[in-house]
A protein has these predicted regions:
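Catalytic core of Fe(II)/2-oxoglutarate
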Residues: 40, 48, 56-117
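Non-heme Fe(II) oxygenase catalytic core, chiefly the N-lobe of the double-stranded beta-helix
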Residues: 1-58, 63, 71-72
Length: 117
């Protein structure tokens, strides 16, 4: 499955700019800013979250990489995203070890902003 995935430069993750609105927090992190490793981006697997593929199909193939309660780092997920994306994070459900567990969580592809080029 990984061999068929699109390649994406690692710095594309950093090209997404942060946004805040309403009760949702929208940023370019897979999960919490309270990640135990500074700069690490990850997502906590949970039965109630979904990742939308770039064509908005469901579920995203990256879900196959996620066992429940596992962590997925950016290098695992990056090949599945061909462009910048935004993560919309709901309220934290609970605290586990050094990271927060969020649900629901949706990764929604968005075009790169001209000012970021």
């Amino acid at each position: 499955m990984m061999a068929e995935a699109l390649e994406m430069p690692k710095d594309s993750f950093d090209s997404c700019h942060e946004r805040h609105f309403s009760e949702l927090r929208c940023n370019n992190y897979f999960g919490s800013k309270d990640s135990p490793v500074e700069g690490q981006r990850w997502i906590s697997a949970h039965k109630d979250f979904s990742i939308l593929a770039p064509d908005h199909s469901y579920p995203h193939p990256a879900l196959a990489l996620a066992g429940r309660d596992d962590q997925i780092d950016e290098e695992d997920l990056a090949p599945y995203f061909s462009d910048c994306f935004t993560v919309v994070i709901g309220q934290p459900m609970q605290k586990r070890s050094n990271y927060r567990w969020f649900a629901p969580l949706h990764c929604v592809p968005v075009p790169k902003s001209p000012e970021l080029n």
